[in-house]
Amino acid sequence: MKHLKRNMALLSVAALSFILTACSTAPITSHSTGIWDGVIVYNFSRFIIYLSKLFGGNYGWGIIVFTIIIRIIILPLMIYQTRTTMKTAELQPKLKQLQQKYSSRDAESQQKLREEQQKLYAEAGVNPMAGCLPLIIQLPVMYALYAAVSRTQVLKEGTFLWLQLSDKDPYFILPILAALFTFMSTWLSMKSQPAGSQNGMTSAMTFGMPLVILITALNFPAAITLYWVVTNLFQVGQTLIIQNPFKIQKEREEKIQTEKAKRKAIEKAKRRAMKSKRK
């Protein structure tokens, strides 16, 4: 499932890049038609403008608050994704045992492997596909945000700090921050996983995803990059609260030490019992 989620993340960025290069440039107004332009993008635009007015017409703050609201809305899904990820990480030793048991590449062995994996997931209450939902939801949100900013005149002309929201960040500060917070988010998630569940792909993606975000953000409007900065910063805070890796590692180590102590106590009791029988 971890590989699937990472592939979905890369696919999302690639799909967004493709979509944004081919999207319509017609202005978004109250006369826009269709479900996408007339309903989704238009209402995104209106909501961001409304939020901006609460901050004295500052469209950057409008996008920041909009992003936070989106993250709060999908928070239940993110919590579910986090719990699913943690359960899957705990299953890795058993999944590896199954892979070794059905190491043959013939069709029958691979079918049995899939069946055993599905059985294991079902017993643990894990849905491998559920972890992809937040990624799937956020892609159209980013696309709609891009369309709202680039095709609504007041947002297109909006500024925030040194930024023209419809243009790239001239000083590359936002792309660097977006990549940094992406790295922090993936690194914290990796730290919470059992040591045996990590592999070369995990480490590669910890550094690979921030690089993809950096390269993409360098070529995207500041509004989209600002969204990435805020959403990944939110993710860092969410991880520290819900999936704190330092707390999880401590609890995992305490559990290991407790189990070791129990085994030692059992062995000690057995030795005492053997001595008593000899007497």
UniProtKB/Swiss-Prot annotation:
Coiled coil: none annotated. It comes from Pediococcus pentosaceus (strain ATCC 25745 / CCUG 21536 / LMG 10740 / 183-1w). HAMAP family: YidC_type2. Required for the insertion and/or proper folding and/or complex formation of integral membrane proteins into the membrane. Involved in integration of membrane proteins that insert both dependently and independently of the Sec translocase complex, as well as at least some lipoproteins. It comes from the Bacteria. The chain crosses the membrane at residues 35-55, 59-79, 129-149, 170-190, 210-230. This is Membrane protein insertase YidC. Residues 253-268 have a biased composition (Basic and acidic residues). GO terms for biological process: protein insertion into membrane; protein transport. A lipid is attached at residue 23 (N-palmitoyl cysteine). Pfam families: 60KD_IMP. InterPro entries: YidC/ALB3/OXA1/COX18, YidC/Oxa/ALB_C, YidC/YidC1/YidC2_Firmicutes, YidC_ALB_C.
